[in-house]
Curated annotation (Swiss-Prot):
It is a multi-pass membrane protein. It comes from Arabidopsis thaliana (Mouse-ear cress). It comes from the Eukaryota. Homotetramer or heterotetramer (Potential). Binds calmodulin-2/3/5 with a higher affinity than calmodulin-1/4. The chain crosses the membrane at residues 98-118, 133-153, 188-208, 221-241, 260-280, 380-400. The gene is CNGC1. This is Cyclic nucleotide-gated ion channel 1. A nucleoside 3',5'-cyclic phosphate binds at residues 486-610. The keyword rRNA processing does not apply. Residues 602-617 are annotated as: Calmodulin-binding. Residues 622-651 form the IQ domain. Acts as a cyclic nucleotide-gated ion channel. Can be activated by cyclic AMP which leads to an opening of the cation channel. May be responsible for cAMP-induced calcium entry in cells and thus should be involved in the calcium signal transduction. Could transport K(+), Na(+) and Pb(2+). Signal peptide: none annotated. GO terms for cellular component: plasma membrane.
Length: 716
């Protein structure tokens, strides 16, 4: 309360003093002089105190920035409530790329101001293209918006405290005051100099209010403003480009875009040099006019060289003093700028015409390193030609080097494939492999290239984090695994475990995946192609069973029985079938160790429903079931035939017994005997046509061995 009263009384005292001083000023000059002196002294004291406080703040900022601690960064970062952008975030990375392109476009638009001056050859005066100056100013203002947005983003972009970098990535400073101090002490001045609308002010404000020789000097000022404003703009592009390549690794996503970007930089330099050539051509002609005016008797008025309706005219003597179409180097040597004056581009208001002509001049001389330039003795003209030659050499070598780098990145895989193919051919020739093996090797390499494009998928996936690798494998394999009916009953966790351990494999046509009697080391899930499986029941004579496998089928189920058996030995199971690829096959392989791990870790794999699914889709169980049904059918047919023959024999015996008392067989006995003999012959023919050579009666037919029953019961 006392503080408020004191403050209120002070305000009243100051007000009353001010009122009394006004009265004294109206009556006494001495008091006025004293009050003025006191006012000046108070202002100087305030300025001195403000200067001391600002210098103290700057020193405090330097000390605080150097000693910015980890605890302060954490506390300020947690306490901040405003939106602070992460310099490593995706938004700023995209914005930096956009801003780099905007800076390059802005640099390409600034030379448009050089096309504003034009020459009126009829009046021999210097004029201005009104349409061009408005267009250049509008385009320049549009690109300046990106600079303003970049400045705003810089005040909202955090930074990593230098003292916190020992803690991994470091702590992001989110204090708005510290961010502003850091930006004001680094790139703020450069950004402000780059965004100042100085060319627009010269074109739209200064030049319209000046006439005569002053306007010529103003055009020179425009030239120097645009030229020197190039410095902060170019200085700002390079660190931004380094920042973009440091955070994201690349500026363009594709090699062709990178090559086009470097070509654009070369063409941009051609455009800039062409614009300077246009402006310097006008400068040289105006210099010739001024010298002619000074030599004229009497000397002409220099303001007549400016195209003004009130003063223009009377410059016909310049046609003889500064000849263009029939140049005279004795009077004035235009040097490399004579072509621009003779072509009429400095007089034309057709912007596309003079733009493309000047662009072609810049591109031609950059590419030829300035060898065709015939300069005069004017020193700045020689410097301009030397700069063109050096810039052309540097830019052309830079363009060729970067284009070669970008284009080589597109053919690296092809070159690697050619080298591998050449090495394979040399190795096959050295080992004297037969032609059929060579064809199979070439076919496999070609098919592998078509499927993978030379990318080592396993190595690529192994370098990724586990969760990302699981998601990628799930995206690639899950939809294909669900085509296998056996996996439809499994839950998500088990499918993720299987997807993580599946390995893509490729097989060419007529290649053997596994042979009967070989150990089975992997379970194969077919995704594309067609296979043939054959079994001979252990090499049994006369036994052959074949099946076709396609997309969604699997083979190597013996490995699943081995993996589910907790008491199985380390020896791998033996394959009961031969599997051969009939065409190019793409599949996923599950190795024995991986299947054993999944079976031991996930007890939900043990279920009766999975047992029935396994039996239904297993080729081994299908073959055994078919052989079992065939054997049962043969037993049934044989039993039925025996019963039929026995019945016929009984009828014959009955007929013979009834006629035993007679001397000759009756007609009925004869019919029964002939029918019995016919049935016997028919049976013999049937059995002979079905089985050749005929097996002895004492050897029963061998059945296919029943597959081992997988242990789907969990051991609790």
């Amino acid at each position: 309360m006392n503080f408020r009263q004191e403050k209120f009384v002070r305000f009243q005292d100051w007000k009353s003093d001010k009122t009394s001083s006004d009265v004294e000023y109206s009556g006494k000059n001495e008091i006025q002089t004293g009050i003025f002196q006191r006012t000046i002294s108070s202002i100087s004291d305030k300025f001195y105190r403000s200067f001391e406080s600002s210098s103290a703040r700057i020193k405090l900022f330097k000390r605080s920035y150097k000693s910015y601690s980890f605890k302060e960064a954490v506390s300020k970062g947690i306490g901040s409530t405003h939106k602070i952008l992460d310099p490593q975030g995706p938004f700023l990375q995209r914005w930096n790329k956009i801003f780099v392109l905007a800076c390059i476009i802005a640099v390409s638009l600034d030379p448009l101001f050089f096309y504003v001056p034009i020459i009126d050859d009829a009046k021999k005066c210097l004029g201005i293209d009104k349409k061009m100056e408005i267009t250049a100013s509008v385009l320049r203002s549009f690109t300046d918006v990106f600079y303003v947005l970049h400045i705003i983003f810089q005040f909202r972009t955090g930074f990593i405290a230098p003292s916190s970098r020992v803690f991994g990535r470091g702590v992001l400073v989110e204090d708005k005051r510290e961010i502003a101090k850091r930006y004001l002490s680094s790139h703020f001045i450069i950004d402000i100099l780059a965004v100042l609308p100085l060319p627009q002010m010269v074109i739209l404000i200064i030049i319209p209010h000046m006439r005569g020789s002053s306007s010529l000097n103003t055009k020179n000022m425009l030239k120097f403003i645009v030229f020197f404003q190039y410095i902060p703009r170019f200085i700002r592009i390079y660190p931004l480009y380094k920042e973009v390549t440091r955070t994201s690794g690349i500026l363009t996503e594709t090699a062709w875009a990178g090559a086009a970007f470097n070509l654009f930089l070369y063409m941009l330099a051609s455009h800039v040099f062409g614009a300077f050539w246009y402006l310097f051509s006008i400068e040289r002609e105006t210099v010739c006019w001024k010298q002619a005016c000074e030599r004229n008797n009497p000397p002409c008025i220099s303001k007549l060289l400016y195209c003004d309706p009130e003063t223009a005219g009377g410059n016909a003597f310049l046609n003889e003093s500064c000849p263009i179409q029939t140049p005279n180097t004795t009077l004035f040597d235009f040097g490399i700028f004579l072509d621009a004056l003779q072509s009429g581009v400095v007089e034309s208001q057709d912007f596309p015409q003079k733009f493309f002509y000047c662009f072609w001049w810049g591109l031609q001389n950059l590419s030829s390193l300035g060898q065709n330039l015939k300069t005069s003795t004017y020193i700045w003209e020689i410097c301009f030609a030397v700069f063109i030659s050096i810039a052309g050499l540097v830019l052309f070598s830079f363009l060729i080097g970067n284009m070669q780098t970008y284009l080589q990145s597109t053919t690296t895989r092809l070159e690697e494939m050619r080298v591998k193919r050449r090495d394979a051919e040399q190795w096959m020739s050295h080992r004297l492999l037969p032609e059929n093996l060579r064809k199979r090797i070439r076919r496999y390499e070609q098919y592998k290239w078509q499927e993978t494009r030379g990318v080592d998928e396993e190595n690529l996936l192994s370098n990724l984090p586990k969760d990302l690798r699981r998601d990628i494998k799930r995206h690639l394999c899950l939809a294909l695994l669900m085509r296998v009916p056996m996996f439809e009953k499994m839950d998500e966790q088990l499918l993720d475990a299987l997807c993580d351990r599946l390995q893509p494999v490729l097989y060419t046509e007529e290649s053997y995946i596994v042979r009967e009697g070989d150990p089975v080391d992997e379970m194969l899930f077919i995704m594309r192609g067609k296979l043939l499986t054959i079994t001979t029941n252990g090499g049994r004579t006369g036994f052959l069973n074949s099946e076709y496998l396609g997309a969604g089928d699997f083979c190597g189920e013996e490995l699943l029985t081995w993996a589910l058996d907790p008491h199985s030995s380390s020896n791998l199971p033996i394959s009961t079938r031969t599997v051969r690829a009939l065409m190019e096959v793409e599949a996923f392989a599950l190795k024995a160790d991986d299947l054993k791990f999944v079976a031991s870790q996930f007890r939900r794999l043990h279920s009766k429903q999975l047992r029935h699914t396994f039996r239904y889709y297993s080729q081994q169980w299908k073959t055994w079931a078919a052989c079992f049904i065939q054997a049962a059918w043969r037993r049934y047919i044989k039993k039925k035939l025996e019963e039929s023959l026995k019945e016929e024999e009984n009828r014959l015996q009955d007929a013979l017994a009834k006629e035993a008392c007679g001397s000759s067989p009756s007609l009925g006995a004869t019919i029964y005997a002939s029918r019995f003999a016919a049935n016997i012959l028919r049976t013999i023919r049937r059995s002979g046509s079905v089985r050749k050579p005929r097996m002895p009666e004492r050897m029963p037919p061998m059945l296919l061995q029943k597959p081992a029953e997988p242990d789907f019961n969990s051991d609790d």
